[in-house]
Amino acid sequence: VYRMPKMLTAKQYMEVMDQVRFNSGESGYDWKSIMGEDLYNSYMDGSNEGTNWVEAIRNKNAVTTSHSLNVTGGSDRSTFSMGAGYQYQDGVFGNVVKSDYRRFTFRINSEHVIYRTEKGMDVVKIGENVYYQHKQNQGIQIGGQYSNELSNMLRANPAIPMYNADGSYTKAEDLKNWVDNYNSYSVNPVYKMLNQQSGHNKSINQNLHATGYLEIQPIKNLVYRGQLNYYQGTSTWRAFLPVFDANRTNADYYRTEDKATNNMSTSWGWSTTNTLSYKFDLQKKHNFDVLVGTEYSESRPDFGFSLNATSSNSVFGDMTHAYMSYMKNNNAASVTGTPCDDTRSMSYFGRVNYNFDEKYMLS
């Protein structure tokens, strides 16, 4: 991260909160009794600046790597291009939780002349484009202005320590004085993040796009193109919510029974595109390019479906085994499923391009 926000120290934070009270005609907080004398004194003498929560989840050594391999070749009648790529990225925020993205791609394109006249005009051509993508992602919550982990860290109290003296995270029992005497929503945001979906989630997506086409040119510059498009995609998402106790005043800050969620969806579809184009000129100055076409696509309920399942009380209590088969309460599991939408569409389109002596253009 090139530029990090400058955060308040614990001492500055306490001064600001006291000033808010003073402006309302109230006395300042009794910080010493809230946090304990030793911690209070370390803030006051500057030996301890408090917790920089944004820095706590910053991944200073985030790695990005990308590799690709491409091969091209052919002849005067056939050409091909093939390539594969791999990309990996560490999340710049996360640090204490796994946050990364990886993607593998493969593509192949080729075109072949089936019939060529003696004068060199390609009458019949066929070709295809195939693209496959595999993505895997796990990370922190990033959506919404307030419902994301960076926002939580920016708004968190720097006077609350992240760790106890023994190295364990501060939890509800350690923050009782904060909850009772300062703010009932006082929480260690890193400990909360560790026990939410931000720390325990994984998604895998696979997509295949394939196109095959036929081009016929019966006379020069009059080209018919028929194209068949196919798409197939699958996605899975798993999340595990462990037992934790960050603050008992908010239902989102503690959990007495772990929970796992499994989502999956699969779908496929197809479409056809047919176009007829013609290029011609008048008196070598008036140049025309005319195209007309149609496209049809459809999706049916039997082309795929989505499934969502949630259950509680895991046998192993970890993300590795966050599957429905490892949950003890499967008899009470919530399971929902929906088919793909039933849709069909037919479209007609056309285009005319004109230029005068390659100086003026109109479309």
What is each stretch, according to the model?
Residues V1-G50, V92-Y101, T105, N109-N207, ...:
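Surface-exposed loop/interface segments of Gram-negative outer-membrane beta-barrel transport/assembly proteins
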Residues L362:
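Active-site-proximal binding-pocket segments
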Residues L69-S75, I108-H112, A210-I216, N274-Y278, ...:
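Residues on the lipid-exposed face of transmembrane beta-strands in outer-membrane beta-barrel proteins
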Residues Q89:
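Ligand-site clamp/hinge motif
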Residues G85:
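Beta-strand-loop-alpha "switch" segments that mediate conformational coupling across diverse proteins
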Residues I57-N61, C340-D341:
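Short Gly/Pro-enriched turn/cap motifs at secondary-structure boundaries
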Residues T64, S75-D76, Y115-M121, Q217-I219, ...:
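Outer-membrane beta-barrel channels and translocator barrels
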